[in-house]
């Protein structure tokens, strides 16, 4: 019962913090139709398999369900934070590393997409037409990187594995976002490559420090969960 209360309090705190948060995603109507559809198609297999795995996970005990809620709240709040950059753009954490470590990339693709839908509908962050692109970068690519890094390094140094999984999962999201923006807006001089470099450099100024912070914060949350034996291991 104490463990359940702790999870509930942590999740509630994250949700309360989200009230005054803001975010940066690819905005509504920004992508040409062909690219908007393309990213939806790429996300579809992850969503389908993710729903199957989420249904199985939801049949677990109350503690498992509360941990799912915590992972979802962590994604929603961190991805809703807005940090202005020196270039006039903005960056934010993603929060997907924690869920990828606890539940694997497929369930995380669902949790991340749900967070993006709520942000688009309730907070006017991102958009529904660009949901596929935003979901692929934050809810698919990021979790895959986080999951792979954690699985690769967890037996050598678990704390380092968590840190790198969350940090590099964050950075990979912005590498993909830069690529998505470059595909939709190739530079007149240099094409997609030049455009990608431009967007990546804009994001890097604030995103690298944010990735480090997210890695540290994810480690703190993981240590709390493991301290109370709330959830162990990773589920693919």
Curated annotation (Swiss-Prot):
GO terms for cellular component: ATP-binding cassette (ABC) transporter complex. It comes from the Bacteria. The chain crosses the membrane at residues 32-52, 66-86, 98-118, 120-140, 159-179, 196-216. It is a multi-pass membrane protein. One of its GO terms (biological process) is cobalamin biosynthetic process. Keywords: Cell inner membrane, Cell membrane, Cobalamin biosynthesis, Cobalt, Cobalt transport, Ion transport, Membrane, Signal, Transmembrane, Transmembrane helix, Transport. Pathway: Cofactor biosynthesis; adenosylcobalamin biosynthesis. This is Cobalt transport protein CbiM. It comes from Sebaldella termitidis (strain ATCC 33386 / NCTC 11300). The lineage of its organism: Bacteria, Fusobacteriati, Fusobacteriota, Fusobacteriia, Fusobacteriales.
């Amino acid at each position: 019962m104490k463990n359940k209360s702790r999870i509930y309090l942590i999740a509630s705190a994250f949700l309360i913090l989200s009230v005054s948060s803001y975010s940066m995603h690819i905005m509504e109507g920004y992508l040409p139709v062909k690219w908007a559809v393309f990213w939806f198609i790429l996300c579809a297999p992850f969503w389908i398999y993710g729903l199957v795995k989420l249904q199985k996970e939801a049949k677990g005990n109350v503690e498992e369900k509360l941990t799912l809620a915590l992972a979802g709240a962590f994604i929603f709040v961190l991805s809703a934070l807005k940090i202005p950059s020196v270039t006039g753009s903005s960056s934010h954490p993603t929060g997907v590393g924690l869920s990828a470590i606890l539940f694997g990339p497929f369930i995380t693709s669902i949790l991340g997409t749900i967070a993006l839908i709520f942000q688009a509908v309730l907070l006017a962050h991102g958009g529904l037409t660009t949901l596929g692109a935003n979901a692929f970068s934050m809810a698919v690519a990021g979790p895959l990187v986080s999951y792979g890094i954690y699985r690769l390094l967890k037996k050598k140094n678990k704390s380092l594995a968590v840190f790198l999984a969350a940090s590099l999962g964050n950075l990979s999201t912005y590498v993909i976002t830069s690529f998505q923006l470059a595909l939709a807006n190739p530079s007149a001089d240099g094409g997609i490559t030049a455009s990608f470099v431009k967007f990546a450099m804009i994001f890097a100024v604030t995103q690298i420090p944010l990735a480090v912070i997210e890695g540290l914060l994810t480690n703190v949350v993981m240590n709390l969960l493991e301290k109370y034996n709330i959830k162990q291991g990773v589920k693919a």
